[in-house]
């Protein structure tokens, strides 16, 4: 399950749908993964859109933060990194 929280602003439906699609793809890579918490916030600098993804897989908490000019860009980067970490953790688990 994907839980989205936006700090100090209201995310529109288009952004929420985008997050569901991008982050939802990550869920299929690990069966026993916990919920994915997505936190959106605005920063005072040029790359002012911040995205934080948090989830738990057995034996490890995963937290990825990315900043970009748009939320879509930050979500894409964070989801890609999360996917890589999950795949690595899964490979490590099955290598034992």
Predicted segments, located by residue:
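N-terminal, polar/charged subdomain of small-to-medium soluble alpha/beta proteins
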Residues: 1-96
